């Protein structure tokens, strides 16, 4: 009887209900994640929905095979990516509708061409459906433009100060 190790057997038997509860919870979480991913995919447009339909099928297949953690991971990843891409798409489309206001902030002269080409890169990425790249390029462009405007404003203030000081020295 000592060879049977009844204490270990009792310990294992007592842990089974907790393990089953854990599996059920994992299964419930996976079902919710798959439903969320499906909803996100249904709200997605065009190519985004088509390119991710296979990933949703993989999540459902993993769930059907009893691999709830894999199914949940795949579904969560899919839902997150679809939402990020949709958000990026909306941000870029909104900005491109205001393209004229963005272009009006560009400096004049040769520097304007550099800024214009950066805006065209955003448009190219958007037209090819690379919304995350377009969003990153747009963010970089607007941050750099804000920085440029700040530096230009500081330079103008310094120039105004120097000119006023120069005029006061001339009139002494």
Predicted regions and their residues:
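Repeat-associated, polar segments at repeat-unit boundaries in modular proteins
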Residues: 1-34, 64-93, 129-156
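Disulfide-bonded cysteine-rich modules in secreted/extracellular proteins
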Residues: 26-44, 87-108, 151-166
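C-terminal modules of long, charged coiled-coil scaffolds in eukaryotic assembly complexes
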Residues: 116, 131-134, 145-146, 160, ...
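Conserved small/polar residues in nucleotide/adenosyl-binding loops
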Residues: 170-172
């Amino acid at each position: 009887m000592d060879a049977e190790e009844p204490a270990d057997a009792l310990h294992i038997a007592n842990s089974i209900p907790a393990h089953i509860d854990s599996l059920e919870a994992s299964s419930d979480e996976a079902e919710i994640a798959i439903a969320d991913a499906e909803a996100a995919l249904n709200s997605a447009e065009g190519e985004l929905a088509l390119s991710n339909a296979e990933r949703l099928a993989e999540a459902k297949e993993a769930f059907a095979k009893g691999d709830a953690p894999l199914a949940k991971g795949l579904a969560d990843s899919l839902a997150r990516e679809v939402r990020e891409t949709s958000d990026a798409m909306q941000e870029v489309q909104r900005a491109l509708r205001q393209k004229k206001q963005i272009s009006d902030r560009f400096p004049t002269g040769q520097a304007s061409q550099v800024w214009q080409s950066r805006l065209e890169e955003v448009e190219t990425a958007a037209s090819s459906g690379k919304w995350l790249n377009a969003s990153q390029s747009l963010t970089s462009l607007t941050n750099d433009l804000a920085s440029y405007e700040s530096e230009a404003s500081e330079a103008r203030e310094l120039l105004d100060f120097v000119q006023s000081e120069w005029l006061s020295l001339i009139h002494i």
